[in-house]
Amino acid sequence: MFDGSDLKNLFSLDGFLKTIQFEPEYIREGEISIIVPLRNNLLRIGEIMNGGAVMAISDAIGGLSAMTYPGIVNQVTVSFNTEFMRPIAKGPVRFISRVDRIGKSIAYVEVLVYDGENLLSSKSTGVYFLYRS
C-alpha cells in the first residue's frame, strides 16, 4: 500500500491533477480521504467550486483507493457518475473514497465530497478496471 507522499507523487504525474493542492487525511486499504483547499484555480463564476474539478478529483481518488489493495498496479475508469447536491462555496473540501466491492478485474467505488461546513455536496460512483502485477 502507498502513503501520503506516494499519493502526492501520483497526482504530480498527471497534467491536470498536478495543479491541485491537497493534504492526505488518511489512506487505508480500500479508503482514501484528502483535504483540498478551495483556491482560485478551482473556482468558477459565482465563487463556487467548478463541477469539473470536483469530478476530476473524485475520479482520481476513486481509482487510487482501489490501488490500496495488494497486487493492483494501475487502474482505469470504466464508468463514473456524479450527483451534485449543493454548491461548494466554502473550503476546505474533503473528498472521501471507499471501495464498495472489488473483484479480480473490476472495483466499485463511492466518493463523497463535503464542503468547509461539513455538508455533503456531491456523491459519485465509479467503476474501475484493475491491472494486477
Curated annotation (Swiss-Prot):
Transmembrane stretches, start-end: none
GO molecular function terms noted in the UniProt entry: hydrolase activity
Stored InterPro entries: HotDog_dom_sf, PAAI_dom, Thioestr_dom
Top-level EC class as recorded in UniProt: hydrolase
CDD domains the UniProt entry points to: PaaI_thioesterase
Keyword terms of this UniProt record: Hydrolase
EC number of this enzyme: 3.1.2.-
Pfam families from the UniProt entry: 4HBT (PF03061)
Record flagged with keyword Hydrolase: yes
Domain of life per record: Archaea
Protein family (similarity comment): Belongs to the thioesterase PaaI family.
Protein name, as recorded: Putative esterase TV1331
Organism annotation: Thermoplasma volcanium (strain ATCC 51530 / DSM 4299 / JCM 9571 / NBRC 15438 / GSS1)
Taxonomy of the source species: Archaea, Methanobacteriati, Thermoplasmatota, Thermoplasmata, Thermoplasmatales
